[in-house]
Amino acid sequence: IKSVLRQDYDNWELIIVDDCSSSYEQLQKFVEDLNDPRVVYTHNAINSGACAVRNQAIMQAKGQYLTGIDDDDEWTPNRLSIFLSHKAQLVTHAFLYANDYVCQGEVYSQPASLPLYPKSPYSRRLFYKRNIIGNQVFTWAWRFKECLFDTELKAAQDYDIFLRMVVEYGCLLYT
């Protein structure tokens, strides 16, 4: 949450969907104490699962573009501004994606010892073999709203929606 608040681009909306966690009151108070109208909190009384929660947030979103962040993720301070500087590419690309980094304190790095860093540049052949993206992309909100995550899948839900987007809207772009 704090990494979203630190973005160098200010016009965003953060939708937090708490899927029936035992510590929801603590999170709810944290969000209330932020007193930031850009941060929207929703608590589910019944656990509905990751795909349903992502779909719930997607459908709540009011913005023109959409990207995601999971509770164990952190964004670099310029994540949104970098994606937005490449938004014209969405005319011919299904979505944009970027490298993962490891954060230690305030230092972001790409350690060579971790096999998933850096991510591979897009190639259709490689993409059809495995998920080279990870779990978060940036694209127009309407694309997410048309595709949505498949709540019936038990694994690879992110890869599934990305494949469907590529088939429907064109290749993807690594930024």
Report residues per predicted region.
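Conserved donor NDP-sugar-binding/catalytic core segment of glycosyltransferases
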Residues: N78-S109
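Short aromatic/hydrophobic "clamp" motif used to bind/position activated sugar donors
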Residues: L66
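The conserved acidic donor/metal-binding loop of glycosyltransferases
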Residues: D70-E74, N99
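Conserved donor sugar-nucleotide recognition element shared by glycan-biosynthetic enzymes
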Residues: G49-A50, R54, R79, I132-N135
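Glycine-rich, basic loop-to-helix element that forms the pyrophosphate-binding segment
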Residues: N44-A61
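Acidic donor-binding segment of Leloir-type glycosyltransferases
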Residues: S3-H43
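Conserved nucleotide-sugar donor-binding catalytic segment
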Residues: L116-Y174
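Short alpha-helix within the catalytic core of nucleotide-sugar-dependent glycosyltransferases
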Residues: I1-K2, Q26-Q28, N55, G63, ...
